[in-house]
């Protein structure tokens, strides 16, 4: 049995002024022609950064210390990348010539980009157009619905799993609305219903927030009342895939030995939930309903 976890992080900060020396250490004093309001000498980029710490607020702190140029023509974004992979493996041989390999994988990666532009009027930096993009994959188990009838044009137009997907949408929408904080100032009422769709306002039948949990619940056989509402489910929902190999057929038969040197039977099951790519909405404001 083995378990592996790996994570990779990176930071790209255009306009970084200091010139690190040995092992990245180096004292830096801002150029007084550009940074007349900052005279403090600092170590850039700092020990936490050198040992691998990736601070989401690194660009803002760098701007306050005079590490970023105030050239207003700078047009490259501050970028942070992050990826993590969990890998579980197990190999079992219950008896000779029978091998069972079990594995489960969860991988998440993202890239966050944001523009830090100097504002000569406020004498500070403005953070603008933050966006997050990435992809996700996780091993799941859809065996409960893998052999369900597909349906036909004459009788049932859709499979049972697909029908469940459509039915579960309303349950998921209600759960999402109930978990949202009411905000009278913005006019949001979690009990309000769209007169056309009959779904809670803000969580329609075609909303990705509704469809993704409904899809996972329908095709994995989970309850729509308990399935994770997160589009990137945690390790709690990770399920294994497997491969079974039996190579003992020939060794057990004298007759087969005359005609075959080796004969193996294999059975494998693989199912995964994949988000090929995602990107955040530039107009999204997570503080509106806080």
Task: Enumerate the language-model features and the residues they cover.
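Exposed, low-structure sequence patches enriched in small/polar residues
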Residues: 1-290
């Amino acid at each position: 049995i083995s378990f592996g976890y790996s994570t990779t992080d990176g930071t790209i900060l255009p306009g970084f002024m200091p010139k690190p020396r040995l092992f990245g250490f180096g004292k830096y004093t801002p150029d007084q022609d550009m940074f007349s309001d900052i005279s403090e000498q600092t170590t850039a980029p700092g020990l936490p950064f050198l040992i691998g710490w990736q601070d989401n607020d690194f660009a803002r702190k760098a701007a306050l210390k005079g590490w970023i140029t105030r050239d207003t023509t700078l047009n490259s974004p501050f970028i942070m990348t992050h990826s993590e992979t969990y890998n579980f493996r197990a190999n079992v041989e219950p008896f000779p010539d029978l091998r069972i390999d079990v594995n489960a994988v969860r991988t998440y990666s993202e890239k966050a980009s944001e523009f830090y532009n100097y504002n000569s009027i406020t004498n500070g930096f403005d953070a603008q157009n933050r966006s997050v993009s990435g992809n996700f994959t996780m091993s799941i188990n859809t065996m409960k619905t893998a052999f369900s009838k597909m349906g036909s044009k004459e009788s049932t137009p859709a499979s049972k799993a697909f029908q469940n997907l459509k039915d579960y949408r309303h349950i998921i929408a209600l759960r999402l609305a109930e978990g949202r904080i009411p905000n009278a100032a913005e006019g949001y009422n979690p009990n309000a219903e769209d007169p056309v769709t009959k779904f809670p306002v803000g969580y329609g039948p075609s909303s990705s927030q509704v469809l993704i949990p409904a899809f996972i619940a329908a095709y994995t056989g989970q309850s729509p009342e308990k399935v994770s509402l997160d589009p990137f489910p945690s390790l709690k929902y990770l399920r294994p895939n497997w491969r079974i190999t039996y190579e003992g057929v020939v060794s057990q038969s004298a007759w087969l030995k005359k005609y075959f040197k080796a004969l193996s039977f294999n059975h494998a099951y693989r199912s995964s939930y994949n988000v090929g790519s995602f990107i955040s909405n530039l107009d999204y404001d997570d503080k509106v309903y806080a």
